[in-house]
């Protein structure tokens, strides 16, 4: 199978799906219509599925062999952002936007599902298509895993994202509340961070004769790819786009709850480039003007398919 050519046959479908999901975004754990639309597409393809944790969906495509079982995952939720683009398919849900590309992720996986369904006779494995809710809440993956159905870096990012204090401009505030996030790749360093942060808070408050309360909640672990799966993925990209289509880098401090899957199963998390300044697709994720180059939908769907075909021969 020439994967890229097979996926290109469905480019119009991929674009239409992406625009439909972009037009109707839903927040984490509220993806009712999104899930229903995904399930209708799976019904039309004749792919059976299970409804998981309400708005999650796990579809199963059986090949000639039961094993290995290989999962392809996408996230489906949107963000609480008021869209500021003038796109004809801009959000119709005021104050909610697919500003992180999840509309594209859904489209890519559904397109990959179509191609894989067309070529079931070439599958020597069982495929799990995982449509995960609530990635932005960072607990959707863990909730799905809890149902039972499914290198050394020292980077640390500490972000203070909110600061609330006071009620009026002419009244001194008695209290202030700050909140934020912490991200690191190093599990041992992650354990040390609460003490490191509290020491800074304590010394700062002592300098100003203030009291403090410190609450620290552990959230998602670092997303660390399996080396073997990464090698398979790299070869898959080269088959589709050539050597120039592959970009490798050490890591990024962005948060991603796919890490819960990687804690339990060997796997790989990859980015699909979608920036194209000539088309106005130049804003970063979570920006009110974010948009993606829809040509990337073909590359993403093709990667899903090619990786599946390559991985089934390696496990």
Show which residues each predicted segment covers.
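Midchain, well-structured core segments that form catalytic/ion-binding scaffolds
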Residues: 136, 142-228, 252-253, 259
